[in-house]
A protein has these predicted regions:
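Macrodomain-like recognition of ADP-ribose-binding/processing modules
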Residues: 1-135
Length: 135
């Protein structure tokens, strides 16, 4: 995700994983827009939602400051720390994430992102799903 809020208060979830999440969770852009306005660009626990036949906890994971930017490794590090805190607080036993910051974020997973994530997401609760093509 990114920190951009539209004039109507909704977060911009226009492409990539953010758009996929928006399609699955009605009202996500409004809820996230409110959180961004109040607390800034950080990871947020967005509650439990039905995805297909499963109940799934949704956590945002900012990789960009603005949707036009490339992803930022320092922000990914900060988001990973926040994700780990959220996982502990809400007792999330398994967290699946795409190779964050890659694709539209223009980072290379093996050369850049993996090193950052491995510093923080250092136990088997966290699983990066490579080859992920969307929800």
């Amino acid at each position: 995700t990114n920190s951009v809020i539209r004039k109507n208060g909704d977060a911009v979830l226009g492409k990539g994983q953010a758009l996929e999440a928006k399609k699955l969770v009605p009202g996500l852009e409004h809820q996230l827009g409110e959180y961004l306005r109040r607390y800034g660009n950080r990871a947020f626990y967005m509650g439990v939602h039905r995805v297909g036949d499963r109940l799934t906890s949704l956590v945002t994971f900012p990789t960009k400051h603005h949707y036009r930017d490339n992803s930022d490794l320092d922000l990914i590090m900060r988001s990973a720390v926040q994700l780990k805190e959220i996982a502990a607080k809400f007792q999330l036993s398994k967290i699946y994430l795409p190779p964050v910051g890659c694709g539209l974020g223009k980072l290379d997973y093996e050369k850049q992102v993996r090193l950052v994530l491995n510093q923080v997401l250092d136990d088997d609760r966290f699983v990066v799903v490579l080859g992920y093509k969307g929800l």
